């Protein structure tokens, strides 16, 4: 079976071609600021990115012959985890999405390209809006603001399944805490195959991260909103985009920050240690959801490469459960394996409604 995987990100479009579970081509098509600045809205980049995918396949002599095309899922309405076939309802919701992100282009490009091939199907898998929260986890102190989830569902679930396979068991039989350490940070409580509690890692909950603010003091945030000093869009960027490490230290580059610390930068040390402290505190809070009965804590994402971060996290959390580290992320493989499982009948294909 031949699969095409498409993963649009903020500044790049990653593609991969798989023959069954073997990658035959993996490419990261980078987009310059000048290229993207010519588009008023992210959704307007659709044709541009689609054509780049086709050109990359042609440049590498890859025949345009696929059994399915799987795209990164976008910011749809909340849905359970799993594999979904792209349909008209999904496309309509993406075209009118309340939140914008390059990931919204994944299902659009997959659907458009699949339509060119007889019998080819278009899928998404485990988008960031996967919502399997226990009802008790949704309730906040204000009925106006129930909790929502936007998190690294694809990578968290892939790492959880990988851990299960390594330990000769099933994801659906485990109680895990999975922490994705990237530009955003999500801490998920996985109970028997479902993420029953997880923070909104995009715009306003959990630990602060390289570019996101995490949970903020509500009263001060209201005062700032009403101060007249910032527009709505400016404030949103101060919550997600120009927040966290980059707001404090002017960079999201953790290795560079660690070098500053080694050179005696006490402010950099205080800020990075504060982020680690907040991550550990969130993991500790997550342990309560499972009554302390945790099979393992899994740390993944780009920052899991940092010995500085991982060593200090382990000091604070290793008393809770065994800690396993899976640096980086492989969303391309996760998407491919989900699509392959759907084609083989090993995973159910769900209908988006």
Role assignments for model-derived ranges:
Residues 53-67, 165-169, 283-295:
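Phosphate/pyrophosphate-binding loops at sites that engage ATP/ADP/AMP, CoA/4′-phosphopantetheine
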